[in-house]
């Protein structure tokens, strides 16, 4: 007798609640991650059928973040029924039930079901290819599904560190003797033995480092020694910041099997959009620079007095915003229990640990600090990560140098603190990705203590692209995420500072001097009138050449 779908899930350790609408499935106690509907259809399901199911399911998702839907259609389905996988609905046939009973099932979210099929299609045409997916969308589960489906063949799995390899092993869920897990660094330590490595499949996680380090050549040797093996690379950030090199083109023959960007993950509600707390940390220096600029400017006395009043008011109005403890007290919810702090290097870490701990303590938080970096060794770092993961009434604060940048999620993380500006957009997204997780079910907090008063945030840059995604067709009931929740003191402060800067802008100052000259002399300055005359002549020339801005 074939077990019921409920029994299949229970055997896998999933939490199941039966209802008229379908089965509510949870991978963790107290959470619902999916609604599964079993359908005994006589004809294959079509796109229209799937859209009707989506409309019904979407009303059930209220109050649940990142909930996905699965239809198990005993009568099969047409390929068009899979059109809504990015929106969170996938369709399966009876082979899905066979997988549940196989003892090697790896459950995938709908967006990863789409990615996995793309991998299978890609390998029908190419021996080597890559998948690019935003951090937190389940790349380790994609690799785990591939491993489980090829468990009888020899597989080599490479990743930057043991912790990432352990995450992949955990996602697989069962032991497979034909699979060999190796770090990139191990290829250097055992280079003489690398020629003995044989595989039918080579899987490379975080492939954007391929070729960037000394081990890149050793990994290339392994690939060349297995000239018939299928090679699959996974990364969230394939563009290397140095030289903006596209590693998909460079190392995977340009064969991009599937891509899911961070923008798509946000828009389609695959990842929760963090609450961005933009701090005014460092505002003192900014206001001091404005003060010096005012003193050096050629403003009229009247304008100087006007701008000085605005500066003085800004100092008074934002006095509370200058202190990091006040920002933390006001904007970091007390429900937050896991905070990641990223440091530039070990020296930076040693300086920031006491400072950040001081801020948190002054903000009224009881904390336990942890440090993870390469100087401690992998075993010690593993023990520290385990301790950080433990549940506690205290705020666990993990200070990291590089190690959590690459492909690793720590369960339960709900906040990230940015302390240093980075020139690498890629690193910024990787840091942001540490608190993004498709299974988290909650909205994380990003404390931005980088002094970015004069620049655009990642949110400012991405918002227009989200608007464009909203123009794509969607099923009834789908609501895409097209906006960000930005809070903190910064937006108001930035507006005030931009107003002051505008008043100190050289063109505006010279224009006012011109008006004053015209009023007093009832004439226009000639080129012999010094700086004002030269400036006025320059504007005339720019106007004649069509280069003067319209508003001027």
Describe each model-derived feature in a short phrase:
Residues 256-340:
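Conserved interdomain linker/interface between the two RecA-like ATPase lobes of SF2 helicase motors
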Residues 368-401:
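Conserved helicase ATPase core of P-loop NTP-dependent helicases/translocases
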Residues 435-462:
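Conserved segment of the helicase C-terminal RecA-like domain
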Residues 496-552:
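IQ-motif-like calmodulin-binding regions
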Residues 212-274:
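Post-DEXD/H (motif II) to motif III coupling segment of the RecA-like Helicase ATP-binding lobe
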Residues 424-440:
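Conserved SF2 helicase motif VI
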Residues 125-146:
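Walker A/P-loop
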Residues 106-124:
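N-terminal pre-P-loop "Q-motif" helix
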């Amino acid at each position: 007798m074939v077990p019921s779908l409920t029994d299949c899930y229970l055997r896998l350790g999933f939490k199941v609640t039966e209802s008229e609408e379908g089965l509510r499935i949870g991978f963790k106690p107290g959470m619902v991650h999916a609604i599964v509907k079993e359908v005994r259809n006589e004809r294959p399901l079509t796109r229209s059928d799937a859209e009707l199911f989506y409309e019904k399911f979407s009303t059930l998702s209220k109050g649940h973040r990142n909930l996905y839907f699965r239809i198990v259609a005993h009568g099969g389905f047409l390929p068009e029924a899979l059109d809504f996988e990015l929106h969170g609905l996938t369709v399966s046939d009876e082979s899905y039930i066979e997988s549940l009973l196989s003892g090697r099932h790896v459950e995938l979210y709908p967006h990863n079901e789409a990615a996995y099929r793309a991998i299978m299609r890609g390998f029908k045409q190419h021996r080597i290819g890559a998948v690019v997916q935003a951090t937190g969308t389940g790349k380790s589960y994609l690799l785990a599904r591939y491993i489980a489906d090829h468990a009888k063949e020899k597989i080599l799995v490479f990743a930057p560190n043991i912790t990432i390899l352990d995450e992949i092993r955990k996602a697989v869920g069962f032991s497979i003797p034909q699979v060999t897990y190796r770090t990139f660094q191990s290829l250097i330590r055992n280079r003489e033995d690398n020629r003995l490595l044989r595989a039918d499949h080579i899987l490379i996680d975080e492939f954007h480092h391929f070729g960037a380090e000394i081990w890149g050549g050793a990994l290339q040797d392994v690939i060349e020694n297995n000239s018939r093996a299928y090679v699959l690379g996974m990364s969230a950030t394939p563009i290397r910041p140095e030289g903006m090199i596209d590693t998909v083109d460079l190392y995977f023959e340009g064969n991009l099997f599937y891509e899911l960007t961070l923008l798509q993950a946000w828009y389609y509600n695959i990842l929760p959009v963090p609450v961005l707390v933009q701090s005014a940390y460092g505002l003192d220096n900014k206001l001091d620079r404005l003060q010096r600029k005012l003193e050096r400017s050629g403003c009229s006395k009247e304008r100087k007095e006007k701008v000085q009043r605005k500066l003085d008011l800004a100092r008074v109005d934002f006095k509370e915003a200058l202190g990091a403890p006040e920002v933390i007290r006001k904007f970091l919810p007390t429900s937050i229990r896991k905070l990641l702090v990223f440091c530039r290097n070990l020296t930076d870490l040693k300086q920031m640990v006491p400072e950040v701990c001081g801020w948190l303590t002054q903000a009224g938080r009881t904390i336990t600090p942890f440090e993870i970096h390469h100087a401690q060794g992998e075993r010690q770092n593993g023990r520290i990560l385990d301790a950080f993961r433990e549940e506690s009434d205290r705020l666990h604060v993990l200070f990291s140098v590089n190690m959590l940048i690459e492909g690793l999620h720590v369960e339960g993380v709900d906040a990230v603190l940015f302390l240093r500006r980075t020139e690498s957009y890629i690193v910024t997204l990787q840091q942001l990705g540490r608190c993004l997780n498709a299974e988290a079910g909650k909205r994380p907090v990003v404390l931005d203590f980088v002094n970015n008063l004069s620049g655009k945030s990642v949110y400012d840059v991405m918002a227009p692209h989200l608007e464009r995604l909203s123009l794509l067709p969607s099923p009834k009931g789908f609501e895409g995420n097209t906006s960000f929740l930005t809070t903190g003191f910064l937006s108001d402060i930035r507006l005030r500072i931009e107003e002051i800067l505008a008043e100190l802008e050289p063109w505006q100052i010279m224009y006012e001097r011109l008006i004053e000259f015209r009023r007093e002399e009832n004439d226009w300055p000639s080129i012999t009138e010094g700086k004002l005359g030269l400036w006025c002549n320059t504007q005339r020339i720019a106007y004649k050449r069509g280069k003067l801005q319209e508003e001027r």
